[in-house]
Amino acid sequence: MRRCFQLCALVALLSSCGPNMGGELVGVDGRRATPETPPFGMVFVPDGSYTQGVGDEDVSYAMTATSKTITVEGFWMDQTEITNNEYRQFVNYVIDSISKKMLIDGGMDEFGISEDEFGNPVEPPVINKKARIDPRSEDQKEILKDLYYQGDETFYRRKEVDTRKLNYEFYWYDFTQAANKKNRYNFEKQKYEGNITKLDGKKEPIRNRGSFIMRDVVNVYPDTLCWIADFSYSYNEPWTATYFWQPQYDEYPVVGVTWKQAFAFCKWRTNLLWDFLTENGESPVHEYRLPTSAEWEYAARGGLKLNMYPWGNNYTRNKSGCFIANFKPLRGNYSDDGGVKTIAVGTYDPNDYGLYDMAGNVAEWTSDAFDESSYSLTHDLNPSYQYNAKPTDKPARKRKVVRGGSWKDVHHFLQCSVPTYEYQDTARSYIGFRCVRSLMGGK
């Protein structure tokens, strides 16, 4: 009995030494912060301030163009533009998901998950990513035949995926509308009172938190016909026929991608990582996204001040007289820089942050909407000018900022400070993109 009393006293003593000892505020116990793993294929861009826009050294434009000093927080950025092979992983994921959805609808329940880990029913069933499609199964072939071109749409009886069906459904949370004070939850009345604007431009009353979740569907296959559509009276059929699927172009930047397709790619890439982290018991990190125009310019400068080009000086040739980017160097001459059209990413030297092709090769989408007066409207801390264009908006409202210049542009568009634009639903043979990811915590 005495030993039992001593044991109880010891337990009570040890308990008093826990996180609530003395009734003090000590925080929640058991939380573990792990260092952020550097994302594969990305380089770190530290936070800092710089002069956005042209500098005083650019005499031609210093008196007419807007510039201001801003600060940008640190982030990770893709070392190169997204390549054909990287984007193909996205396309193949969509093909696999659509195929499994068709098999589930065809009665093959092994391709779906109808119960969660607690035994609760899941409706509709979630796609089972671990299930494998058997290309030799005649039953599966019969169900999946509608995914391929049929009848007179086939070319020499080749079995080819109908790219018109490669639609990716994705969601995101509209924090901007959720942060509007008129849209906040009214605790006194125990309800929402505001209205929210959906992607189709329609306004509807806020029902609950789900009203701020946006749903979109985008066809993910690149517009391979852009090589012909972009240039009249120019023979570019070989690039249209082979550029995206031919292995020799795997390390070339993906083109023919609209802003919305690039946006969808970022959402898919985020979910790909989050699913992996969740399965391994790790906490999610910040999402992948397109860089803001300010982030892109800051990264292009490579930590230098007021430089005209990413390589640090005001010239497009090195000491040997060779061009140091892929662009249109001379009138009617595309080849003197070493590439007529796009070339493999990372061919030229990187800037001081280790980023390749921040000038030339292909121009790059950013997340910002294009407006000539945006510099005077945006904040000086992490400036960002966002606008989700509605289908009914005028074309000018659908413009997105494009940076860096491309293989078909003259040197002016290669400057760090020069933004231009393209319409968000337009695909070009000279526009690609790269992703960024915000840094977790401080430096």
Walk through the language-model features, giving the residues of each.
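Bacterial Sec-dependent N-terminal signal peptides
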Residues: M1-V28, A33, P38-F40, A299
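Functional-site microenvironments in short loops/helix caps that host divalent-cation chemistry
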Residues: G18-E24, F44-V45, T51, D56, ...
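Short, P/G- and charge-enriched loop/turn segments at secondary-structure junctions
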Residues: G30-R32, T64-A65, N388-K390, P419-Q424
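Post-signal-peptide N-terminal segment of Sec-exported extracytoplasmic proteins
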Residues: P35-T66
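Short capping motifs at secondary-structure boundaries
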Residues: F75, I82, V91-K100, W268-F276, ...
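Coil residues (strongly favoring Ser/Thr
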Residues: S97, E153, T163, F175, ...
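Non-catalytic, alpha-helical, charged scaffold/linker segments
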Residues: M102-N208
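Short, structured beta-strand segments at or near domain termini in extracellular proteins/domains
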Residues: S429-K443
